[in-house]
């Protein structure tokens, strides 16, 4: 019998076994990596250097997932979490890690993905940009709602690896001005007796509570997300909220009737005040709706934008196309440096908001086009000099990548919150020698989590 077969049949290599191991690294999901019986074991809530006692909870032939039972010897990278439910809540993965070590680990994530998946061995990599704040940085929070067995309205985030809610009254990574709203609004919902949606029974109304703040203006927007209209006395309660909180600019009701995990529905109704909150970003004014996309860490996004502008070295004569534009967060600042800008966005509300933002800032050289990148990009009458890509986590669709190769814009700026899909797409764009990477810049948009933002500039290779 071979050695590997001996390990496979070892009484310890099975679900429920309790073993000791040492964490030697982190994967891109933020889990600790250890080894037992020459096989990889992934353990959440751990740090490189930890010596642990763990229970194997999911066992495969070559790897296992484990639950932390006891820290036998803590890593020097450990720190006390700022959140009292950090060990339960699934919102943050790295509350227990020293912030400087988080930064180093995120830089390594980028390197590992580009080397392992992309095959890039020589990278023009800049030092990772740290977030201006490691706590209190989030300008938006959307909480699932539930009701306890005693009737208490709960709001929070799901437990790690489950769909069970962890009730919270404050969250250290969100803007502190939202915490008071969270606590008081939960009480008001409870006092009103509004029904809470039950996912198992597919009954009830209120599903989520969404809070957004313009961190530079202080304006806030409150949105209730419900399966149905008809919350009793909603207008009265909305008026009370506006009177109680001077910085609260509006209350909205979003309708999401589908029995799925989608958070926002297609219909949003303004109940009181304005349906937007205003924010300052890159010396511009932005209006943000209940469900329009905007980077949740304004300070870090501004840092990355500044470095991107420097690296692109725009001369003023370019046509720039922003292929996943949102409300124009990056489109509008960059438009001031080019001849013409085109913003492609699939969300119609974001298109309208982007057009409004251009008008507010008197930026006349931007056109917002509604539709998917797959359908709109091939119809453009002029090939862009600069193409900006900031796709969802899944990356660019294959047809988008093929269209980029067909058009061959001179420069591509690709921004991603998912290094593995970024590396995959870069590998495709550079595979035939059409493009070369000239600049790689990571930025910490999401402190206390394992997520990292990365921007890459590609330049067309002549011939």
Swiss-Prot record:
Its EC number is 2.1.1.-. The keyword 4Fe-4S applies. Disulfide bonds: none annotated. SUPFAM superfamilies: Nucleic acid-binding proteins, S-adenosyl-L-methionine-dependent methyltransferases. S-adenosyl-L-methionine binds at residues 295, 324, 345, 390. The active site is at 417 (nucleophile). The keyword Glycosyltransferase does not apply. Pfam families: TRAM, tRNA_U5-meth_tr. GO terms for molecular function: 4 iron, 4 sulfur cluster binding; metal ion binding; rRNA (uridine-C5-)-methyltransferase activity. GO terms for biological process: rRNA base methylation. Residues 12-70 form the TRAM domain. PROSITE patterns: SAM_MT_RNA_M5U, TRAM, TRMA_1. PANTHER family: RNA M5U METHYLTRANSFERASE, TRNA (URACIL(54)-C(5))-METHYLTRANSFERASE. Belongs to the class I-like SAM-binding methyltransferase superfamily. RNA M5U methyltransferase family. This is Uncharacterized RNA methyltransferase sll1967. It comes from Synechocystis sp. (strain ATCC 27184 / PCC 6803 / Kazusa).
């Amino acid at each position: 019998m071979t050695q590997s077969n001996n390990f496979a049949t070892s009484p310890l290599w099975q679900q429920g076994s309790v073993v000791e191991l040492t964490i030697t690294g982190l994967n891109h999901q933020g889990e600790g990596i250890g080894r037992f019986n020459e096989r990889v074991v992934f353990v959440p809530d751990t740090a490189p250097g930890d010596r642990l006692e763990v229970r194997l909870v999911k066992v495969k032939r070559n790897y296992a997932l484990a639950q932390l039972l006891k820290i036998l010897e803590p890593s020097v990278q450990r720190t006390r979490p700022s959140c009292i439910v950090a060990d339960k809540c699934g919102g943050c993965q790295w509350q227990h890690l020293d912030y400087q070590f988080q930064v180093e680990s995120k830089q390594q994530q980028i390197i590992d993905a580009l080397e392992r998946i992309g095959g890039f061995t020589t990278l023009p990599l800049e030092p990772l940009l740290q977030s201006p704040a490691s706590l209190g940085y989030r300008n938006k929070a959307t909480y699932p709602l539930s009701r306890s067995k005693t009737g208490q309205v709960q709001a929070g985030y799901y437990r790690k690896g489950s769909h069970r809610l962890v009730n919270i009254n404050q969250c250290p990574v969100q803007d502190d001005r939202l915490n008071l709203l969270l606590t008081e609004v939960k009480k008001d919902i409870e006092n009103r007796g509004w029904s809470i949606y039950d996912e198992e029974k597919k009954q009830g109304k209120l599903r989520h509570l969404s809070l957004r703040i313009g961190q530079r203006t202080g304006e806030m927007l409150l949105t209730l997300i419900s399966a149905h209209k008809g919350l009793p006395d909603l207008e009265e309660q909305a008026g009370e909220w506006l009177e109680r909180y001077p910085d609260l600019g509006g209350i909205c009701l979003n309708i999401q009737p589908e029995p799925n995990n989608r958070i926002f529905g297609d219909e949003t109704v303004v109940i009181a005040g304005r349906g937007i909150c205003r924010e300052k970003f890159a010396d511009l004014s932005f209006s943000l709706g209940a469900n329009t996309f905007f980077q949740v860490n304004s300070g870090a996004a501004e840092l990355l934008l500044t470095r991107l502008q420097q690296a692109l070295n725009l001369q003023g004569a370019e046509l720039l196309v922003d292929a996943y534009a949102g409300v124009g967060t990056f489109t509008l600042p960059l438009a001031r440096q080019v001849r013409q800008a085109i913003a492609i966005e699939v969300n119609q509300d974001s298109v309208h908001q982007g057009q409004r933002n251009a008008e507010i800032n008197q930026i006349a050289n931007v056109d917002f086009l509604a539709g998917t990148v797959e359908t709109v990009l091939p119809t453009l009458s002029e090939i862009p000099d600069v193409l900006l890509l900031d796709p969802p986590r899944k990356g660019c669709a294959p047809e988008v990548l093929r269209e980029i190769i067909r058009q061959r814009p001179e420069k591509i700026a690709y921004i991603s919150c998912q290094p593995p899909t970024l590396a995959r797409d870069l590998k495709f764009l550079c595979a035939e020698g059409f493009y070369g990477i000239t600049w790689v810049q990571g930025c910490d948009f999401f402190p206390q989590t394992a997520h990292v933002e990365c921007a890459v500039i590609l330049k067309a290779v002549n011939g």
